C-alpha cells in the first residue's frame, strides 16, 4: 500500500485491526468481519515503535506472545529462532532502551510474528534499518510469504515494494487511485520511457510531438513519451545521427506511476 503522508494508510491498517470502525462497509478476513476478538490471527508492526523501553527483550517478547494467546513454553523456542536469525541473540537479556534503533526495529518485527499470524501488517517495516539489516528483514518477509502468510505493508521504498509485492494499492486522500496486480498495472500504464546513451546531444528530441518529459542523465537522456508509436519516431530520428550506445524502451517504474497518480509534490 502506497500513498503520501496523510493518505490514509495507517488509518486503513487500524480498521483492519479492529481498532477503528469504517464509516461505511466493513473489514473482513476469510469471509468474517474483523473485530477485536479475531486479532490473534493478525500480526502488526506499527510505524511508531511501541515497545516498553525498560523491559528486557526476553520479557517483552514473552509478554506480547502471551497477549496473543501463546504459552511461555511455545514462545521461548520461537523467540530464540528469530533472535538468532536476526543476529541479536546477545540482546535477549538487555533492556529495549539499550538497543540501537535498528535492533529495536528487529525486536518489534519479532513481536509481530512470534505467534505465527495468518495476516501480517507491516507499516514502514524498513524504517531505521541499514542496508544489511534491511536485507535480513526482506528475506524474512519473503520466507513468511512462501509459508502462506498474507502480508500487507506500506513503504516509501519503491524498490522494496517492486521486489516484494504482487498486488498494489495507491491511496490519495483515502481513495484508491491505482489498485490491482503490480505486473498488470505496469503493463497497462500508457506512458513509456526511453533511455538513450551516446556521445552526441539529444536536446532536439524534447521538441518532438508526444515527448512529455526530458531528463538529462549521465551519458545520455531519459524521455517519457505518450506511447510506443512515439518511441518508434524517436528511434528513427536518433538512427539518422549514426552510432548510439544504447536505445531502450523501459517499463515505467513504480516511482513513475506514483508521481503520475499522486503528484510530484508527494514523490
Curated annotation (Swiss-Prot):
It holds the Pfam family ABC_tran. Residues 2-198 form the ABC transporter domain. Belongs to the ABC transporter superfamily. Keywords: ATP-binding, Nucleotide-binding, Transport. The keyword Transmembrane helix does not apply. One of its GO terms (molecular function) is ATP binding. It comes from the Bacteria. ATP binds at residues 3-10. InterPro entries: ABC_transporter-like_ATP-bd, ABC_transporter-like_CS, ABC_transporter_ATP-binding, DrrA1-3-like_C, P-loop_NTPase. It comes from Alkalihalophilus pseudofirmus (strain ATCC BAA-2126 / JCM 17055 / OF4). This is Uncharacterized ABC transporter ATP-binding protein BpOF4_11395.
Amino acid at each position: 500500500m502506497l500513498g503520501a503522508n496523510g493518505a490514509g494508510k495507517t488509518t486503513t491498517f487500524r480498521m483492519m485491526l479492529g481498532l477503528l470502525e469504517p464509516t461505511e462497509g466493513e473489514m473482513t478476513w476469510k469471509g468474517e468481519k474483523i473485530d477485536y476478538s479475531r486479532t490473534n490471527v493478525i500480526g502488526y508492526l506499527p510505524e511508531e515503535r511501541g515497545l516498553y523501553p525498560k523491559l528486557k527483550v526476553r520479557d517483552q517478547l514473552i509478554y506480547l506472545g502471551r497477549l496473543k494467546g501463546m504459552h511461555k513454553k511455545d514462545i521461548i523456542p520461537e523467540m530464540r529462532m528469530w533472535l538468532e536469525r536476526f543476529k541479536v541473540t546477545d540482546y535477549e537479556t538487555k533492556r529495549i532502551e539499550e538497543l540501537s534503533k535498528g535492533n529495536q526495529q528487529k525486536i518489534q518485527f519479532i513481536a509481530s510474528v512470534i505467534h505465527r499470524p495468518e495476516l501480517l501488517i507491516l507499516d514502514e517495516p524498513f524504517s531505521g534499518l541499514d542496508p544489511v539489516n534491511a536485507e535480513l528483514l526482506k528475506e524474512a518477509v519473503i520466507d513468511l510469504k512462501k509459508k502462506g502468510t498474507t502480508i500487507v505493508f506500506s513503504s516509501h521504498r519503491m524498490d522494496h515494494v517492486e521486489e516484494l509485492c504482487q498486488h498494489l494499492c495507491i491511496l490519495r486522500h483515502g481513495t484508491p487511485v491505482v489498485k490491482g496486480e503490480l505486473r498488470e498495472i505496469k503493463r497497462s500504464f500508457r506512458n513509456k520511457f526511453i533511455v538513450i546513451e551516446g556521445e552526441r546531444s539529444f536536446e532536439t528530441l524534447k521538441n518532438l510531438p508526444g515527448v512529455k518529459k526530458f531528463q538529462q542523465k549521465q551519458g545520455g537522456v531519459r524521455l517519457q513519451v505518450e506511447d510506443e508509436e512515439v518511441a518508434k519516431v524517436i528511434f528513427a530520428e536518433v538512427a539518422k545521427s549514426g552510432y548510439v550506445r544504447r536505445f531502450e524502451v523501459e517499463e515505467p517504474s513504480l516511482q513513475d506511476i506514483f508521481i503520475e497518480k499522486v503528484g510530484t509534490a508527494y514523490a
